[in-house]
């Protein structure tokens, strides 16, 4: 029997709700068709936003949405996306499929979407091909309430009051598609550009996000922090509130990646092993951040994460459309448990991407919509949002097929909500073994337990023909004991228990 020990009274760090954030890019069917269908569409919508998608995202309590990219951000010129839609400039989306971008979804539409979702806004600015003035004017257009050229332009375009801008990314992947810069050059550009990302509302300031590393480029993290911190007052923390990190699971590597649906046991464990590498990245980048920011004033912002496979057969390679199986449910559960466990440093994360792209929570086909296994994991984990991480540990054993890609059989994280409920989330990575869990809750009287679970065979998925193949089901097989609870977690599953 496996032992899980939980100390509800030993609170460690707040699990920011923003850890459960999402990412939407102008990557063909993510924004267009997936979220925005236009006011004249036969698909039910409110001001052009699909009502089915909006309601589904509200259900999982989407806390924050990042936009417009991604690589698209550093070629996006925001003034092309305001004003009458019939006069907006068209452009070629050179990064994603070479298709025409008509800019019908722009700043006003994004903030309309955030208002419908009830979520915070994370805008990524253009440092790669844009000017300091362009970035400065965008922030002014969005947030300034008084009399100014940009505020007047916003009012002329139909929005009298400014919007609340919570997060602003000063460039994206500037080590790659955002300009192929070296870390010192980018850091100095960051210092210049961020100066003009002005906080016009001290009562709700903009949180500035600096472009961080790709995967394990620890030199980038070190050099960017060194340059930004050596040229400003210590208490300003490099003039940043967050430092980003991007990491994707590519089962077979960057060039081949591998199929989203056709994989064997070896690739299953290899994929989960790569998902677990997120913890190593957080710890090693976090150690460098600790040198310059021991008080953890700068949040680690994992604003692109998830599984990235070879696109579905017959689809445009530049649209990054892929299916979603129980493997993705496990990747999501594993990763979110890691984020929770490191919530002292990880302050926001954004799954890539929200609809129809990469490890999305929703897939659409015309008027039809399905919820992916990943969606259902976010649905179960939503109770961790803004709860307090508590001390917990679980006994594990090593499993797998190939020696190089071994994994622990279980992962977990536990939080206590404001109402006192204890929320336990566990993943069983095994393809063939259930585990009986003896759970000890120290100094805690268990009165009631509710459970829910997502589980199935590794290839199970939701399709437009079978949209409910994978879904959240009640889990009632929990026994109360003198020391806590006892239950058995099935193979290939993600489980949530609420204990009161």
Model-derived regions, located:
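Non-catalytic accessory regions flanking glycosidase/transglycosidase catalytic cores in CAZymes
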Residues: 1-242, 278-279, 283-311, 315-500
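Histidine-centered active-site/metal-ligand motif
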Residues: 246
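Phosphate/diphosphate-binding loops
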Residues: 274
